[in-house]
Amino acid sequence: MLIALGAVGYSSHAQATDEIQVYNAGIAAVGQLTVQQHLNYVGIGQKDPPFPGGFPSNHSLNGTPEFAYGMTDWWELGLYLPFAVQDRQFLSDAFKLRTLFVSPNADKRNLFYGINFELSYEMPKFAQTRWGLEIRPIIGVRNADYEFIVNPIVDVGFGRYGEADFAPAARVARKLKDDVYVGLEYYADFGKIGAFSPLAEQQHTLFAVTDFKVGDVDIDFGVGYGLTRASDRLVVKTIIGYAFPVPGTKDSSERASASGPINPMAHLSARSTPY
């Protein structure tokens, strides 16, 4: 989801860079398992902790394996196991569970939509609240050459330090040929809903991205630049994904679009949290 770890001053949580995607409503086929590995490196990031006891994002490697399973042609379940590596120290951020509802066959529609609910349990170095909820609407349009997708995300933290933040993400991309896209992705965190942070303390990051396939493997690569003081200045993101064959078929050709939660990726376009 983008979210650069760290902010000016203290906030209740450090928005993690474990998953940087814009969801495009693509899901796994019924009975299909997909696996993605997210890896994101903060080359130039925040050097101060986002809250007392938190860890700064500078020179950190963040990621998560993502497992998704298609329940129906409009419903998918997913599991994440986020982590970070910094100064040769491995830090686990527990787990996230998600349930995604979409318009069926979203990868074949000119207008597509959906909504994702993601429940997370986070460790003390990553957040001051243990439990959180992400609500991510998905709205997109595409034609033969272009696609435009918006995820107006609301991140909710529960407990004493909890708050609801507005953290939208968006993507515009052009299709160069089958399974090859280039474009821009934008991730932000405006802060608490009803009391947005000053601009300098908001997170706004712009990524140049490309999605392509190597055999049956989907690859998403992007380089992001932070536009405000509170944003990580330089972030490199990658997603490597594979959709297992649907039971009863001979190959893995029956894969949904991916890039949304990027799951069965027809083309790996989008998802993100802010980041």
Residue ranges with predicted function:
Residues 1-6:
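Sec-dependent N-terminal signal peptides
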Residues 14-275:
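Transmembrane beta-barrel domains of Gram-negative outer membranes and organellar outer membranes
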Residues 9-11:
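N-terminal signal peptide c-region/cleavage motif recognized by signal peptidases
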